[in-house]
Amino acid sequence: MIKINDFNTQHISCEYADSVIKMERHFKMGNRYLSYILNERNFRDDIMLCPPSKLIKVIESFNLRFPDIDYDAEDWRYFRNYMIRQYERVRKGILHLVLNSLNLSVCPYCNRQYIFGTDNNRKVGAQFDHFYSKSKYPYLALSFYNLIPCCPTCNKAKGEECIEINPYIEGFENNGKLMVDSPLNCILRNADWEVKFKADDRCKTNIQAFALDELYKKHKDYAHEIVLKSVAYQKGYYNDLKISFRNIGITDETIER
């Protein structure tokens, strides 16, 4: 899993929020949940542009304001369905432009499938996952940093499942690495080797949600090629060191020690 480059996300997110506000000037009122996010909160700044690390605070504030939500009640179902409909309108009219602006070519969840935007509104080679489910947290349905551009495979795999790592904040970095469990067997093309993740608990949540272990096991040919190149590079680097140190009087025996 990779981090989404944030060099211009602030500009893009503001542009996105302003566009949505223009489209949705006439949000319907008369619902207590809508009244809360539109009147008691600054919908644009507090919710739509809420930084990814603070989305959980929005959830906590909402739960504090409405501690006893009846999820089967008519007012909640109206609010949920209304916010999801607004998202669907935005997705069709604006989000392909956001995707293009992010300059993101590969799915951040799996770092495997290519995604792309188009210059028209008919086709977008990515889907948008709600990091926090739009069904459970409809007030975040339009939050920019809750919308994760991803490939259809990852979007379907995750569904409404909660995961630990938001790619707007971080990727796996050094906490989730792909490893070859037996480099020697890999080099010799013996059957007994696998590509596996060495990961902490937070990364494991994402790995399980997107079945990344199974996905990367299918790429043993690529892993074999990478291991061979790594060995070749190290051998070439070692030979270069020997030549360089010989010139200053250091013997091969000393280098090998």
Provide a role label for each language-model segment.
Residues 1-95:
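N-terminal accessory alpha/beta regions
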Residues 2-33, 196-257:
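C-terminal, charged low-complexity interaction regions
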Residues 43-50, 141, 146-150, 159, ...:
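Short, exposed beta-strand "edge-strand" segments with a Pro/Gly-rich flavor and a Y/T-containing core
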Residues 91-98, 135-141:
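Short, intrinsically disordered, charge-biased short linear motifs at domain edges
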Residues 96-125, 151-153:
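Short cysteine-rich loop/turn motifs with clustered Cys
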Residues 114-146, 160-166, 170-176:
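Histidine-centered nuclease catalytic patch
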Residues 134, 150, 154-157:
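Ligand/cofactor pocket segment of small-molecule handling proteins
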Residues 157-217:
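Domain-level detector of nuclease and nuclease-like folds
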